[in-house]
Amino acid sequence: MQNTTLHIRHLGQQDYESVWHAMQHYTDTRNNDSPDELWIVEHPPVFTQGQAGKSEHILNPGDIPVIQVDRGGQVTYHGPGQLVVYPLLDIKRSKIGVRQLVTYIEQSIIDMLAKYTINAYAKADAPGVYVDERKVASLGLRIRKGCSFHGLALNVDMDLAPFRRINPCGYAGLEMVQCRELGGPQTVIEAGDQLIITLSQLLGYQHLVHHQGLAAS
């Protein structure tokens, strides 16, 4: 049965590992009655290497830490000025397939950017969202016990230079772009507020409940 309520957790800026472990804990301990949640966060500079990641795609990390994680995909960069959204959803309960969830996430970003007259699109062979062949958003999910965690990263107003220290998502020379350059949302808060609307609508949630910070464990 579809759960029509989505809980939104606004986490502010939090270090990557603590949020990652909190996602794992929430997913491992949830049951059939646990609410679906969307976590909105920014991370300090960090490279994360997905399960398909190859070390040769990390060219010159320098002083930015590299963390091996349990999501799909290859290496990406997180940093201040980037909107990170983690959908912690019981997709088995909602009867949403993994591919369908990826499509919904990509489409929510496309729909949000369309409000700013930005023509963004997805690619069948390279998950994420693009504008004029430049990547504005990256995706990497994990499904455990029929529930999703990890999620999406949307470049809003950030230093894109660290992306040049890696082959983003395993693609050498892939050019990144951000919302500020495109005339899109200018802040992470603005982008998050808009993306919550488009994503919750596509996923079929009718009620949104907002929280500051993580629930006490």
UniProtKB/Swiss-Prot annotation:
A family per Pfam: LplA-B_cat
Coiled coil: none
PANTHER family: LIPOYLTRANSFERASE 2, MITOCHONDRIAL-RELATED, OCTANOYLTRANSFERASE
Localisation per UniProt entry: Cytoplasm
Any one GO CC term of the record: cytoplasm
UniProt: substrate binding residues: 71-78, 138-140, 151-153
The UniProt record lists the keyword Cytoplasm: yes
Function: Catalyzes the transfer of endogenously produced octanoic acid from octanoyl-acyl-carrier-protein onto the lipoyl domains of lipoate-dependent enzymes. Lipoyl-ACP can also act as a substrate although octanoyl-ACP is likely to be the physiological substrate.
Single Gene Ontology MF annotation: lipoyl(octanoyl) transferase activity
Catalytic activities: octanoyl-[ACP] + L-lysyl-[protein] = N(6)-octanoyl-L-lysyl-[protein] + holo-[ACP] + H(+)
Protein name per Swiss-Prot or TrEMBL: Octanoyltransferase
CDD domains with a match to the protein in the record: LipB
Alphabetical UniProt keywords: Acyltransferase, Cytoplasm, Transferase
Single biological process term from Gene Ontology: protein modification process
Pathway given in the UniProt record: Protein modification; protein lipoylation via endogenous pathway; protein N(6)-(lipoyl)lysine from octanoyl-[acyl-carrier-protein]: step 1/2
Organism of provenance: Shewanella oneidensis (strain ATCC 700550 / JCM 31522 / CIP 106686 / LMG 19005 / NCIMB 14063 / MR-1)
Native organism taxonomy: Bacteria, Pseudomonadati, Pseudomonadota, Gammaproteobacteria, Alteromonadales
